[in-house]
Every structure is written in C-alpha cells, then in structure tokens.
Amino acid sequence: MLSAVDSQTGMNDTNPEKLTTIEQAFEILELIHTNNGEKPSDIADSMDVSSSTAHRYLNTLVEKGYLVKEDGVYYLALKFLTLGERARTRKNVYTSAEEYADMLAEESGCRSTFIVEENLQGIYLYTSAGSHSVWTQSTIGKRIPLHATAGGKAILASLSDDKVARIIDQGLERKTSSTITSASTLREQLTTIRDRGYAFNREEQIQGVNAVGAPVTDNSGEVIGAFSVSGPSNRLNGDRFTSELPQILLGITNEYELRITLS
C-alpha cells in the first residue's frame, strides 16, 4: 500500500499547499503567455496576491529558466522551445508527417498542416507553405477548436461517439459567421465526412479562408492526426476546392498511411 509521502522524494501527495503553489506558478505562466509579458504588479492584481508573493514566484521562475526579465517586464523564456520540441517529437508520427506535409504543400501550392488531438483540442504539429500559400495563423503548437477546422473535423469524424460528445459538451465556439455551432448539424456533417473520407472548412475558422482535411489512421484504424490544405476562398472554390484538392490530399494521406503500415 502506497503512503501519502513519497519515500524517494519526501513529497507529501496530500499537501494542498504544495498543490496550490504549483497551480499558482502555472497560472503565472499562462498569464504571461496570454498577455505576451506581464509586470509584477499586473500578476499580483490578476491573482489577488501581494506584490512580494508575485515577485517570489517570478524570481523563482527566472532562476529555473522559464522566464526572462526585460525592462521590468517578465516574458516566457526560450526554454519553452526546447520543451515544446521534445513534446512534439514524442509523437512518433511527427518526424515522417513533416515530409508528407511538405509534399502536400508542394503539390497543391497551398499551405498544408498536420494536426493531432490532445485534451479534446487540436494542436498544429507542423505547417508547410506552398508556392501560392497565405498565412493562416496555423503556427506550430497553436491549439484550435476541432469543430471549426477541416483537419479537426476529419479527426472528429474518426473519434468514438463518446469522445465527440465530450468535445461538443465543451461548447462549439463561434469563430466566424460560418462556424458550425449546432451539435446536431455538426453530427450530420461528421456522418458525411466518414462516408466521403475528407472534410471541408468553408470560412469556418477564418473569414475568407477555405480548407480541406483528411484523417490519418494507423494499422489498427485509430486516428492519429490529420492533414489539411488551406487557402483564400476566392482561389479555393469550384472543382479545385471540391474535387482536385481532395484527390491530392487523399493521395498523399494514403501514401503516408502505407508508410506507417510498413514501418
């Protein structure tokens, strides 16, 4: 039987003070990330703690290499790049997915992305710019709502009904006037996506940007991510959007799945 005290570390697992300290440290990091830098006084006000307490937390995080201080303002340190890269490459699919996303961008001329689902959200693991691509906010590491993106809906269509329900229960955030916010409408579309094999995003995440996404599954049939291509809606329309790009996308996705099978 395990004791509440870890015999190796001496840490008391039931000590609420230790948990609160950890939670507050992470809250500070989230505040600094959200606001792209914070002053100690802002941290103290946001967290309802004294100025001295805020300074202690900030100085400790600086000492540990997680924050840097510039002109009295605290920012996230580059250490997070190292941590993020390790987390990203922990996904075995990443290293080879990068190669196929590059192929997809080159063949389509569009911006391509590879995303995965984690904690009921989508995360961009890789993005590649084609010859005619535009910037679409698809930065590596960015978290996105699955229901508002082509790759996200492709993943959703491959998840269990229970997991889809949990994602819907979080709320279907409206990103544009075209975002699907009705659970019944989303479920109907997911059925179509399963039958068709790919998903469309018609200006549902960013006004003026369309996208097509397809799920990537492993040998057991479990979805491990999704590729997508995106571009301006005035270019991605008609047969190019509904037929040509889906065929390019499915071809490269199938090649990648074959590589997974043979590896």
Across the structure, where does each feature detected by a protein language model lie?
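N-terminal helix-turn-helix
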Residues: 2-94, 102, 254, 258-262
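Conserved segment of winged-helix/HTH DNA-binding domains
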Residues: 79-108, 125-127, 132-137
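Short regulatory alpha-helical segment in sensory/regulatory domains of signaling proteins that mediates
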Residues: 101-109, 113-116, 257
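Short hydrophobic alpha-helical segments used for membrane anchoring or interfacial signaling
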Residues: 113-119, 127-128
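Short, solvent-exposed recognition segments
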Residues: 136-205
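Sensor-regulatory modules in signal-transduction proteins
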Residues: 216-219
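Glycine-rich acetyl-CoA-binding "A-motif" of GNAT/NAT acetyltransferases
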Residues: 223
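Juxtadomain coupling helices with adjacent low-complexity linkers
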Residues: 226-263
